[in-house]
């Protein structure tokens, strides 16, 4: 899940786009 903290940490570390991940999480709810 995009909302999973581990996923957010991994993706943000990989792409540097934590804000985008958060937007995806909010948009999916």
Curated annotation (Swiss-Prot):
GO cellular component: extracellular region
Molecular function GO labels: alpha-amylase inhibitor activity
Superkingdom of the organism of origin: Eukaryota
Keyword Cell inner membrane appears in the UniProt entry: no
Keywords: Alpha-amylase inhibitor, Secreted
Localization annotation: Secreted
Coiled-coil spans in chain: none
Entry function: Alpha-amylase inhibitor.
Assigned protein family: Belongs to the protease inhibitor I6 (cereal trypsin/alpha-amylase inhibitor) family.
Name the record gives this protein: Alpha-amylase inhibitor 2
Species annotation: Saussurea costus (Costus)
UniProt lineage: Eukaryota, Viridiplantae, Streptophyta, Embryophyta, Tracheophyta
